[in-house]
């Protein structure tokens, strides 16, 4: 009689756990200093609402004098990417701190790490809300140790292209409606939004627009959201990530930048297109290596989303000398989802 040796159900479960631990150790160095970007342990949950702990481990909270003002994205063990408008020139870096590993901003957790800021590099072309160059690099005072709750997101290379219609996720701790703060304990919020082409976004922003105050969608901007409105970013999340999934990894496709009201119809959220600044990022931080983004799907034509005529004249708008005006976004954009479904 042949002797058959097999594993019981409990042994198989134990083996699976060991394999999972081994996989995580291969992605997180023994000293916690290395981790592959854009990988998460939590399964993806579509839609909107509160995220789960560790679901977006690159999301950080940027505080000014102890108050949350903006979001940001961890891209290495010592660098964070955020929006330039989060750091007015008159503010000192000593007044900022970066909170990593947080889920509920108002709750204490051993997973949370707070670092002071050693350096802030804002893009030189940034001038005001809605202008080009709304991106900043923040160097932490010391390297952070990666964990299940603290991990970097992938930076896209300069030639990266994210297709129209791709469903990405914007995250943050901002307002849930205009002038309505997220309630204690302020859990991290997530909202899935489809990407919209620059041409269609410009067309939408021309609907009911004030001619003297054009909303110009620049070449370094990316739009995402819903034509009917109701779900968007709002005050409190500027600088946070627009994370897009490509071939099993998450990429920092956009940085929450500006918008015209929160969740208004025909006004999708506008983000800084991170890939535009891949060379600028590498110039200032040589160790940051943007990744080539695989082209896994074609862009979906979205011209039908805007039937407004005439089509917004982008070239003419760029020639106007009058400043572009938006809502007062001094500490800008946070997740917004009106209760339209109720």
Swiss-Prot record:
Subcellular locations according to the entry: Cell membrane
Q: Which domain of life is it from?
A: Eukaryota
Q: Which UniProt keywords apply?
A: Cell membrane, Disulfide bond, Glycoprotein, Hydrolase, Membrane, Protease, Secreted, Serine protease, Signal, Transmembrane, Transmembrane helix, Zymogen
Q: Which GO terms describe its biological process?
A: hair follicle development; positive regulation of sodium ion transmembrane transport; positive regulation of sodium ion transport; proteolysis; response to mineralocorticoid; response to peptide hormone; response to xenobiotic stimulus; transepithelial transport
Enumerate the glycosylated residues.
159
Give the pro-peptide residues: 30-32, 323-342
What the entry lists under Gene3D superfamilies is as follows: Trypsin-like serine proteases
GO molecular function term, any single one: sodium channel regulator activity
Which cysteine pairs are joined by S-S bonds? 37-154, 70-86, 168-244, 201-223, 234-262
Q: Where, by residue number, is the active site?
A: 85, 134, 238
Main location, first listed in the record: membrane
- List the membrane topology term(s): Single-pass membrane protein
Q: Got a GO cellular component term for this one? A: membrane raft
Q: Has UniProt tagged this entry with the keyword 4Fe-4S?
A: no
Its EC number is 3.4.21.-
Enumerate the transmembrane spans.
Answer: 320-340
Could you say which residues form the signal peptide?
1-29
Where is each Peptidase S1 domain found? 45-286
Write down the Pfam families for this protein, in alphabetical order. Answer: Trypsin
Q: What is the annotated quaternary arrangement, including any partners? A: Heterodimer of two chains, light and heavy, held by a disulfide bond.
Q: What does this protein do?
A: Possesses a trypsin-like cleavage specificity with a preference for poly-basic substrates. Stimulates epithelial sodium channel (ENaC) activity through activating cleavage of the gamma subunits (SCNN1G).
| Family the entry assigns | Belongs to the peptidase S1 family.
This chain's protein is named: Prostasin
